[in-house]
Amino acid sequence: MIVFDSGEGQADPYVGAIVYDSFISELAHQFHGAMIVFEHRFYGGSLPNGLTLESGEDLYQYLTIEQALADVAALASNFSVKGIKSDLTSSATPWVFVGSSYSGLRAALLRERYPHAIYASMAGSAPVETKVDFYEYFKPIASNTPAKCRSVIEEVVNFVDAAFAGHNETLKAELKSEFSASNLSDFAFGESLQAPFQLFQNVGYASPFTDFCEYMTNQSQISWNMSSDRRLTERWASWPQQASLSAELTQSNAIDTIEARSYLVSDGLAKFLFLVSILH
């Protein structure tokens, strides 16, 4: 049994891609296994009786990591399918749990806490360790980004870093305006520039990160009436997806309630502006 955990979201959108076109389906075919797309409690249709938008607030006491982990162990220990005589429970059939990000953390915890139920786990991008200055995160992105695109990104990042490290408020205002981010704090603006790299995390170098690199390195469409770093920054700001991605990353005002200190770390893509936050 190979279980894919949809994490903090409904499972339906994942079913087609996971079952018919994924490395997980390849594993299932290779080992003659069956697949399950698991939906986390309190997401999608996996809601307790009585919970609505208007009522049932007391039920949220059952939305805990421990109880959500126990759901998986209970399923593995008692699973059966009508019409199949084989024992599919974890006592007779190996259960492999697959997840990434939060669900990757769940995969690691399940193997540790329920070894009798989970035979093996595949934990991708699992945040099992808390670290303030996690510059290593960007290393795979740097090493897998074409040299020309990486050079352009470095130039823009260095320029923006220098602008926000100084006291030229006019330049900072101009940059925020170009990125449709005039209402954002300096910290939130820095966060918004991570948008293309979030795309790399989600889908690898394939589109739309590929589109970003091609857009940034298309010299025929770059204005030449200003300095190199300035015109490349303007080019980044005009990338069609930047505004919407920035809005997604900063849709919550919570990011502006954070007191931040910035560090320039000479590693990964460039001296990227790493923001170390201290919650009030």
Predicted feature locations:
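Alpha/beta-hydrolase
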Residues: 109-279
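Intrinsically disordered, low-complexity regulatory regions enriched in Ser/Pro/Gly/Thr
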Residues: 28-31, 89-91, 115
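Active-site phosphate/pyrophosphate- and oxyanion-stabilizing loops and adjacent acidic/basic residues
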Residues: 25, 108-109
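Substrate-binding/catalytic groove segments of enzymes
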Residues: 81-87, 119-120
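Structural recognition of the beta-strand scaffold that forms the well-ordered cores
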Residues: 2-4, 34-38, 96-98, 120-124, ...
